[in-house]
């Protein structure tokens, strides 16, 4: 699992569409599908029903997974803001 895979899944779940997620991420729809399949295979869960790029139906496991994924991404963002921000402030003081 990578942070990028989590990001791809949260965006796909938000739109309930692989095609719309691809547009937001500026990558191809097959690339979105590939990243999500890596997650599905690693955790052996079905995140969504449907195989087309149009509308996908998020499964119960998929909804739970996206909540955890979004929380992980939020915590990483907070970590970056906290410690990268300190590094920038220290650099300005010198």
Predicted regions and their residues:
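Interdomain hinge and pocket-entrance segments immediately C-terminal to HTH DNA-binding domains
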Residues: 85-94
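Short alpha-helical elements of helix-turn-helix
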Residues: 1-15, 33, 63
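Short helix-boundary/capping micro-motifs
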Residues: 12-26
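A short LG(V/I)-centered, amphipathic sequence patch enriched
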Residues: 40-58
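Hydrophobic two-helix hairpin corresponding to the core of helix-turn-helix DNA-binding domains
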Residues: 9, 21-22, 59-62
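Short, solvent-exposed amphipathic helices
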Residues: 60-75
